[in-house]
């Protein structure tokens, strides 16, 4: 029988109980039954109490958040117009006539003939994709002195930043969650206090032009670009570009997925563009510095999950192209930001490669079954296709390779990993071990399916000597749960790790908690947010702050987990601080406004903040 648990007690497993609270309605409470030493169950569950003591009086609720934020003040709109877009009063006669004609073509033919008569699939229906707490919010300037219950460990000094999709304009056609404009949410913590919270759009060239025009004009890569209407929208966009109504030369990306701090810069990324540099100001605000090309060295898009080697300080990255060869390129930056030459990796067809992995000496590149076939649009379908005839494989390439001829490919049939959590080398067997979440159906995020989605935490072993592979589910069948978005202790990235901290993606696509998984034994410890409470990616902050290395005296799990949580019934948002070793709640930070569910985050320590470029 599972044990129950009281926060800040030595128990190691618990079950959730509820009791009425006069101040907040239903809240979670738990009771201690046995000490940690007696716990031997393979799986345990910890609950997240509302974490607000009875004496706590929450701050007044903020004004209702508008479903879609307005363009901002007049000065910001004028600045955006000068940077990126042209308002109609700045167009010549030909451009004004072209704008009217193209707008009429969009409304009369694309919208009324190609799109309106056809129901949208759930994967492109904005009523589904951005409903509830997936809906966007407006920007929030820094709000200071956030209420805290519990105790924030004093070594956590810095900023927790998390990226996400937040459409600035209400969709008028198809929209996928991944299509939204990038917005970064940031909580500044110092000396046990939560000093501030802020959220800001990443000011991409795309967003600047759309603000200047007063509406969305750039195609949405997933929600709109399918079938004949997708072809028409692409043609419309190119026509507007030829007429000088929009300028795609400054990038078309949304910078809504990943965040990495490298060489003095916080970079916001999506795989359709160069990264954008975002600076954290002294008062906890966020400002976009601009599109970052590494001082003129980077001329192509970069995926949203580059890998920072914790030992060498190098940043490793991929870039894929859906139109022309080479479909995939690999490169890296040394610790000072100097870029290597590209290594062109030969692929037979353009392939979605959202993530990859590094070991101490190699990069591990997935070449899986989700591919791009633009010709499917002419047949009325989506260009993102599950190619069942293709054999999935992983490529193992030396980190400092100069040619793809050094790549060793190993087949791993029927495997699709949207994310890879870590990889390492095992000298005795000559194998490269990869840990990722294998998703079925592989294209379920992009194409509607009646098949139940599963995301199985999997260990994949690649024998580069024999070209053979093996795989096993890390969790036993009885404990299987969908695990997505998360991380290992990044101080050990590319080296053998025992633990991974991953979001419990149930009920999909919401996240009801996170899990600490022992990758060797399959032991699972869940931290559940509680009934009606959902969050996102758990962010591991090692003891000593981001960048602190694990050591024999400091265990791999010696640190804390940060995670945003939304209480949908109470209408409140919080930042939880959870002990990563025993999975006990340490502190809860009450946030002043709604934080939508988002994607990936990172922690920037105080030393890094002080040396921002």
Swiss-Prot record:
Binds 1 Fe(2+) ion per subunit. Its EC number is 1.13.11.51. Fe cation binds at residues 305, 354, 419, 600. Induction: Induced by abscisic acid (ABA) and salt. Induced by D-allose. Induced by drought stress. It catalyses: a 9-cis-epoxycarotenoid + O2 = a 12'-apo-carotenal + 2-cis,4-trans-xanthoxin; 9-cis-violaxanthin + O2 = (3S,5R,6S)-5,6-epoxy-3-hydroxy-5,6-dihydro-12'-apo-beta-caroten-12'-al + 2-cis,4-trans-xanthoxin; 9'-cis-neoxanthin + O2 = (3S,5R,6R)-3,5-dihydroxy-6,7-didehydro-5,6-dihydro-12'-apo-beta-caroten-12'-al + 2-cis,4-trans-xanthoxin. InterPro entries: Carotenoid_Oase. Its cofactor is Fe(2+). Residues 37-50 have a biased composition (Low complexity). Residues 1-15 have a biased composition (Polar residues). It is found in: Plastid, Chloroplast. Residues 1-62 are annotated as: Disordered. GO terms for cellular component: chloroplast stroma. Belongs to the carotenoid oxygenase family. This is 9-cis-epoxycarotenoid dioxygenase NCED5, chloroplastic. It comes from Oryza sativa subsp. japonica. The gene is NCED5.
């Amino acid at each position: 029988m599972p044990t129950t648990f009281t926060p800040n007690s030595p128990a190691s497993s618990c079950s959730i109980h509820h009791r009425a609270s006069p101040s907040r309605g239903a809240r979670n409470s738990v009771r201690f039954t046995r000490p940690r030493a007696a716990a031997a169950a393979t799986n345990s569950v910890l609950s997240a109490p509302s974490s607000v003591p009875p004496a706590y009086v929450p701050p007044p609720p903020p004004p209702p958040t508008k479903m879609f934020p307005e363009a901002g003040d007049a000065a910001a709109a004028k600045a955006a117009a000068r940077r990126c877009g042209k308002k109609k009063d700045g167009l010549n006669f030909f451009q004004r006539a072209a704008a009217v004609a193209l707008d009429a073509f969009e409304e009369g033919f694309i919208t009324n003939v190609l799109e309106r008569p056809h129901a949208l699939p759930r994967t492109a229906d904005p009523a589904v994709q951005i409903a509830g707490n997936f809906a966007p919010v407006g920007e929030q300037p820094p709000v200071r002195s956030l209420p805290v219950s519990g105790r924030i460990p004093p070594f956590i000094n810095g900023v927790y930043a998390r990226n996400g999709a937040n459409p600035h304009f209400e969709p008028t056609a198809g929209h996928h969650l991944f299509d939204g404009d990038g917005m970064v949410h940031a909580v500044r913590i110092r000396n046990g206090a939560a000093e501030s919270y802020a959220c800001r759009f990443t000011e991409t060239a795309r967003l600047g032009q759309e603000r200047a025009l007063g509406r969305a004009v750039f195609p949405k890569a997933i929600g709109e670009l399918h079938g004949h209407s997708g072809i028409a929208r692409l043609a419309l966009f190119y026509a507007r570009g030829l007429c000088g109504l929009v300028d795609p030369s400054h990038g078309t990306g949304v910078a809504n997925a990943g965040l990495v701090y490298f060489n003095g810069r916080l970079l916001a990324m999506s795989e359709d563009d160069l990264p954008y540099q975002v600076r954290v100001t002294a008062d906890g605000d966020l400002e976009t510095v601009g599109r970052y090309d590494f001082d003129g060295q980077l001329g192509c898009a970069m995926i949203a999950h580059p890998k920072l080697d914790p030992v060498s300080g190098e940043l490793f990255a991929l870039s894929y192209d859906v139109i022309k060869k080479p479909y995939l390129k690999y490169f890296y930056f040394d610790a000072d930001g100097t870029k290597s030459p590209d290594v062109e990796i030969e692929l037979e067809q353009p392939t979605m490669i959202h993530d990859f992995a590094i070991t101490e000496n190699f990069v591990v590149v997935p070449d899986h079954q989700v591919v791009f076939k633009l010709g499917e649009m002419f047949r009325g379908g989506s260009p993102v296709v599950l190619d069942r005839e293709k054999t999935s494989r992983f490529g193992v390439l030396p980190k400092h390779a100069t040619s793809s001829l050094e790549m060793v490919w190993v087949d791993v049939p029927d495997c699709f990993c949207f994310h890879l959590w870590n990889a390492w080398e095992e000298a005795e067997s000559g194998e490269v071990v990869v840990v990722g979440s294998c998703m079925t159906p592989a294209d379920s995020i992009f194409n509607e399916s009646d098949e139940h989605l599963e995301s199985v935490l999997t260990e994949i072993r690649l024998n580069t000597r024999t070209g053979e592979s093996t795989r096993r589910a890390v969790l036993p069948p009885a404990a299987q749960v969908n695990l997505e978005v998360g991380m290992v202790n990044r101080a050990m990235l590319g080296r053998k790790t025992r633990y991974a901290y991953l979001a419990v993606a149930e009920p999909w696509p919401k996240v009801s908690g996170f899990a600490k998984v022992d990758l060797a034994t399959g032991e699972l410890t869940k931290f559940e947010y509680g009934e009606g409470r959902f969050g996102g990616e758990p962010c591991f902050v090692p003891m000593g702050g981001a960048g602190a290395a694990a050591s024999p005296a400091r265990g791999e799990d010696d640190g804390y987990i940060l995670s945003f949580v939304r209480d949908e019934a109470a209408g409140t948002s919080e930042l939880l601080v959870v002990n990563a070793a025993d999975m006990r709640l340490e502190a809860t930070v009450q946030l002043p406004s709604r934080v939508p569910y988002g994607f990936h985050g990172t922690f920037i320590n105080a030393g890094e903040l002080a040396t921002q470029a």
